[in-house]
Each structure stands twice: as structure tokens, then as C-alpha cells.
Amino acid sequence: MAAKEVKFSTDARDRMLKGVNILADAVKVTLGPKGRNVVIEKSFGAPRITKDGVSVAKEIELADKFENMGAQMVKEVASRTNDEAGDGTTTATVLAQAIVREGMKAVAAGMNPMDLKRGIDLATTTVVEAIKAAARPVKDSDEVAQVGTISANGEAQIGRFIADASQKVGNEGVITVEENKGMDTEVEVVEGMQFDRGYLSPYFVTNPDKMIADLEDAYILLHEKKLSSLQPMVPLLEAVIQSTRPLIIVAEDVEGEALATLVVNKLRGGLKIAAVKAPGFGDRRKAMLQDIAILTGGQVISDDLGMKLENVTLDMLGRAKKVTISKENTTIVDGHGDKAEINARVAHIRTQIEETTSDYDREKLQERVAKLAGGVAVIRVGGMTEVEVKERKDRVDDALNATRAAVQEGIIVGGGVALVQAAKKLNDLTGANSDQDAGISIVRRALEAPLRQIAENAGVDGAVVAGKVRESADPAFGFNAQTEEYGDMFGFGVIDPAKVTRTALEDAASIAGLLITTECMIAEKPEPKAAPAGGMGGMGGMDMM
């Protein structure tokens, strides 16, 4: 086992604080509408340029192991805030640095670290309640756009795109962000249910120009297993031909003779037909087939339920006004499903969302809700270069998460003003002893740090700005760093989601409390490396050619 290096008390805390400062100083330059970029070297390709706090934090690893421990703890603040709220990572980092810095000074002055932490926790709880009380619901798409704009470092176009996408898909909808190959950023809304499976043969195409199969007023057969032979389906196919409607087969797979027969019938014009694979895998495939069945008013033909293809009749098939199938995707528009059954299915999936502990499962379940009840919007982010596209995509992701958070818990004044106003609630708060009071004072001072940093990044004296905002009796009065004006922040459209600000403070105080109460640090001692072997001796008596 390798030898360990152990550091205690002041020595340990000083090294840890140095690491905290290095990481926080790198992250906080990105804060606010006039925040600067951070350029990150990549092992291959162009460097990455970003204004996303958590992306910067994740890249930082320090050579000194004790300093690195401090940096990693603050990195945890950014990661936790990003996981919970999806934005506010820079604010959380700035708050954590401010609390740790003040807390370390208090510990060095001889105060009890445990009482300091109790005071910090007490103050944090009070401020969180004040933030929740100050929050108000999002009224309209303009406010959604404002939240998105602020989170995207002041780019109004991004805020507008997100507001448009939210309006089109509704509260149940899902918005995803992708990179666009062109220069323009655009929003594409998919109506109905879309899943990522395309036609099994290009011979099913009805529109050769676009290479898609467009089938209107179609029947949909949902089969859980593979189809290798069409013999059991002959009675059903004859009924479909008599109805003169198209048929879409959605099955685990359609192969061999079955696929060949379908293609021949399609080419001869006897049958308007297309076949696609069922979406998903395993249990998720079964669930998604059931979703399609409920949306289209059909049934899933399953051996588990004792159903046989020979016995399938037209009334067991799903129906849809239009089905569009491309090489990669299938979209079902206006399914004939019963509204009450669709709502019951959505409620059932929502219950699963609440119960699941897996983020991946939660995301997939939310997508299923969106496909049944709302819609799916895709924001395709464009730019002149790949580096620019990636930088903008980071900001669109942040803005999207911020708008979701705003819808969940409401909005408060932005620009760091809400924290400064909430700090006034701490004026009358007292702890059980003087050390706890010191912990409360630490939080009171730290709450001004984000506002100061936003001002300083805009080239203005942070202390002067914080003083003016603190003295104002108007809770909405603040400093708009974009225009460098003082006034009503709601009027300026500078608003933040309450959830983001609350989460940032809670996570910062939690990790800062742990750092302040650290008394000992243990790290592996670097092993001395052996000196490299000497070079080969000269070879005397040989003439050089």
C-alpha cells in the first residue's frame, strides 16, 4: 500500500481553499450577460469555447492533491445544481466560494466550525423560504422568453425560440436540442406520435422525391413478435384490400418471405402497405406498442394474451388520419383512440415517473407522455463553425432547463437581486450562540457575491452596485448589467427561475459547510520516480561516415 500524506487544521484548510479559489475563479468569469468565455483544450480537434459553468468545472483537475480535493468538492456543487435544476451552476459556485472563504476566516479566528455550520444551515433555510415566498408563476410566453434569454447570457433569439417551442408543444410536450448542419437555428415541431424506426424496404415509398411513404386514413396492425410468413394473415389482408384503405404493419420484425410478399403486392398495386419495426427493446417495446394501440384505438396482437393472427379482424386494428414513414422515423398523426383512454394512459405513465429513481427511465417516460398528450419540438442549433455551434448549444441547453424550472416553481427578480433582498430576512435572525450568529453573517455577506460578480464582469464596481441594491426598499430594484442601468428588474425582463436560485444556494451551503468543518486531509504521497538510465557510451576508434 502506498504511503499517505496527512495534513491537519489550518494547513489542510489553506490548501483546500486554494483549490476552491482556482476552480471558482475559472467558473465565475462566465457569470452574467457580459460574462467572458472560457477556452478548453481538447485532446483532438479544435478547442471548446463555453460559457457554461458546469462544463468549465468538469475540466479542472489540479496537480496538488490537497488543492484538488477542494476543487472537486466545489465541482460537486456545480454538478448537483446542474442535475437538480439544469442551470445556476455558476451562481452555485460563486456562493460556495464566498461561504467557504468567509467561513475559513472565522475558523482561523477561533470560532467553533460546527456552530458556524449550524448558523449557515439556519440562514440558508430562512433565505430559501424567502425565495419561495417571493416567487410568482410564469404568466405568458414573453416571460418564458425572458427567462431563456437571461440564462443564454442575454441572447434574445434563444429565449424566443424556446418560448415558441414551449407554446407549440404545451406543458406536456418535450423539447430536445440538436446540432444543425446549417448556419440557422430553427425549431421543428413534430405533431402526433413519432418513433425512431423507418420503413423496412424502400419499395414502400409513395413519394420518391422526398423518399417517404405517406399513407392516409390507414389501418395499423400492431404485432409483438416477428413476421416470417403472411399465411396466417391472408384473411386480414383480404379484408384490408376490400376496405381500400392502406395498412401499416408494426412488428418486432418483418423478414424473409413475409417482407418479399408485401413488397410484391405493393409494386403490383393490389395493396397500399408499409412495414416498420416496433420502437424500443424488451419491456419498453411492449409499453410503447401499447401506447400506439391506445393512441390509434387498436389492440396489440400478443401471444401472451392468446391472440392469433388468423383471428384478427379489422376492428382490432388501429386507425390514424395520416402516417408518414421516412428512412429513420415513423409519425402517426390524429390517431382514432378514445380520449378518456389516452388520458388514463398518461396518468398511469405519470405515476411511473414519480416512482422511478432512474434519470434515464424518467426521461423516456416523459417522452412517452409527450407523444401521447403533447408533442415533441426539436431546436436545431446552427452556427458558422463547429466550435460556435457547440458553444451555442451549451447555452440553449441551459436556457431550456431554466425555463422548465421557471414553469415548475415560478420566477423571481434576476441579476442576483433576489438573494440580496432575501438576505434582509437574516437581519432579525439569531442563533443559539455567537458562533452561530457568525455563521448567519457569513451567509448574509455571501448572498451579495453573485450580484457583485455580475457587475464586475460588466466592468462596474461590484461593491458600489451591491450597496445601492441593498439600500433600496423596492424588492424589484436592481442593476441590469446588459444595459448598465438601475431600475425595476421585472420591467427590464431580468428574471430568474426560483428553483435555480434556491437549488444553487442549498447546494453551495451544503458543500461549504462540509469544507469549513474539515480538520484533516489524507492524500496518497507521490512516489519518487527513478532517474532515467544513462545513455550508451561512446564507441571510440570509429570514423564517422
Swiss-Prot record:
Enzyme Commission no: 5.6.1.7
Top-level enzyme category: isomerase
Record-level Gene Ontology MF annotations: ATP binding; ATP-dependent protein folding chaperone; isomerase activity; unfolded protein binding
Gene3D superfamilies: GroEL (3.50.7.10), GroEL-like equatorial domain (1.10.560.10), TCP-1-like chaperonin intermediate domain (3.30.260.10)
GO BP term, pick one: protein refolding
Gene Ontology CC entries for this record: cytoplasm
Residue positions binding ATP: 30-33, 51, 87-91, 415, 496
Keywords: ATP-binding, Chaperone, Cytoplasm, Isomerase, Nucleotide-binding
Family annotation (InterPro entries): Chaperonin_Cpn60_CS (IPR018370), Cpn60/GroEL (IPR001844), Cpn60/GroEL/TCP-1 (IPR002423), GroEL-like_apical_dom_sf (IPR027409), GROEL-like_equatorial_sf (IPR027413), TCP-1-like_intermed_sf (IPR027410)
Reactions accelerated catalytically: ATP + H2O + a folded polypeptide = ADP + phosphate + an unfolded polypeptide
Record's subcellular location: Cytoplasm
Domain of life: Bacteria
Family annotation (PANTHER family): 60 KDA HEAT SHOCK PROTEIN, MITOCHONDRIAL (PTHR45633)
Family: Belongs to the chaperonin (HSP60) family.
NCBIfam families for this protein: GroEL, PRK00013.1, PRK12849.1, PRK12850.1, PRK12851.1
Subunit: Forms a cylinder of 14 subunits composed of two heptameric rings stacked back-to-back. Interacts with the co-chaperonin GroES.
Role according to the record: Together with its co-chaperonin GroES, plays an essential role in assisting protein folding. The GroEL-GroES system forms a nano-cage that allows encapsulation of the non-native substrate proteins and provides a physical environment optimized to promote and accelerate protein folding.
Protein name: Chaperonin GroEL
Source species of the chain: Rhodobacter capsulatus (Rhodopseudomonas capsulata)
